[in-house]
Amino acid sequence: MESVSCSAAAVRTGDMESQRDLSLVPERLQRREQERQLEVERRKQKRQNQEVEKENSHFFVATFVRERAAVEELLERAESVERLEEAASRLQGLQKLINDSVFFLAAYDLRQGQEALARLQAALAERRRGLQPKKRFAFKTRGKDAASSTKVDAAPGIPPAVESIQDSPLPKKAEGDLGPSWVCGFSNLESQVLEKRASELHQRDVLLTELSNCTVRLYGNPNTLRLTKAHSCKLLCGPVSTSVFLEDCSDCVLAVACQQLRIHSTKDTRIFLQVTSRAIVEDCSGIQFAPYTWSYPEIDKDFESSGLDRSKNNWNDVDDFNWLARDMASPNWSILPEEERNIQWD
């Protein structure tokens, strides 16, 4: 009897194990099916994103070409202040179009658009000076070297951008200045208070590199801003039309407004941010974010010129390329506590 009972128990145990093994099969199959469906959905989403980017690129090109032609026509026949103001308004629209398209445009197309916009802005400034007799006389007496130094062909009937550059006041080259060009900024300085004004910055690329214990104030609307190899610096900048880049910085405090912020190899830095898209950090630690609070008398005008939407601020929407876990916050960046945001900028 005991042997029969043991045999029956063994059979029951074997049946239970077989049933458990069989129950695992559907779970594995279900898991594989879920993974397969997720992969299919990812590929589908990727195709859709590519199609959307392609459509957006076509829309950008068509809109930009149409608006550029309209501005060129206004500038060619600019005989009144009203027509110039209409051209200025359309140029602001083009600036906003570029800002809104920065994420899906190829780098070459983006640069071409920015250069075309810069030429049109220079042509507008030239036409405005053309309505003033004194400025017209100064333009006629300018040497041939300035007119012949352009490297980019302007639109038909529109003066090349370099003429506007040569005819406008340029910053004096101080110690540590990078010199007048499309790029301006400071480098290799320590324990200095550095400033640039709107007339020096407008739609130019700003490069700040190898600064230590410096305070930098940029009053105006640059096109891009790059800060590299800075230590214990304070940087205050007006609205930047496109991107701000930080690399290899430490123990800094920044106030910046921009379309996109990218931070690389930086640590222990506080950033007071206005960003219309998002911030991206990579190989960073100890980064703290808070809303942009710096202000100066002409900042509203500079925001309008930049094309940034001041009502939109994603200062706490940050992507960490070194932290892919969605269910846990990145340890590399955090929100600056409110009690620590009271900064005396000036």
From Swiss-Prot:
Expressed in the retina. Expressed in the rod and cone photoreceptors, extending from the inner segments (IS), through the outer nuclear layer (ONL) and into the synapses in the outer plexiform layer (OPL). Strongly expressed to the photoreceptor connecting cilium at the tips of the IS (at protein level). The modification N-acetylmethionine is found at residue 1. Residues 1-26, 140-171 are annotated as: Disordered. PROSITE patterns: C_CAP_COFACTOR_C (PS51329). Changing residue 262 to A: Inhibits stimulation of tubulin GTPase activity. One of its GO terms (cellular component) is cytoskeleton. Disulfide bonds: none annotated. The modification Phosphoserine is found at residues 80, 168. It is found in: Cytoplasm. Keywords: Acetylation, Chaperone, Cytoplasm, Phosphoprotein. Residues 171-323 form the C-CAP/cofactor C-like domain. GO terms for biological process: post-chaperonin tubulin folding pathway; protein folding; tubulin complex assembly. GO terms for molecular function: GTPase activity; protein-folding chaperone binding; tubulin binding. Supercomplex made of cofactors A to E. Cofactors A and D function by capturing and stabilizing tubulin in a quasi-native conformation. Cofactor E binds to the cofactor D-tubulin complex; interaction with cofactor C then causes the release of tubulin polypeptides that are committed to the native state. Tubulin-folding protein; involved in the final step of the tubulin folding pathway. PANTHER family: TUBULIN FOLDING COFACTOR C, TUBULIN-SPECIFIC CHAPERONE C. Belongs to the TBCC family. This is Tubulin-specific chaperone C. The lineage of its organism: Eukaryota, Metazoa, Chordata, Craniata, Vertebrata. The gene is TBCC.
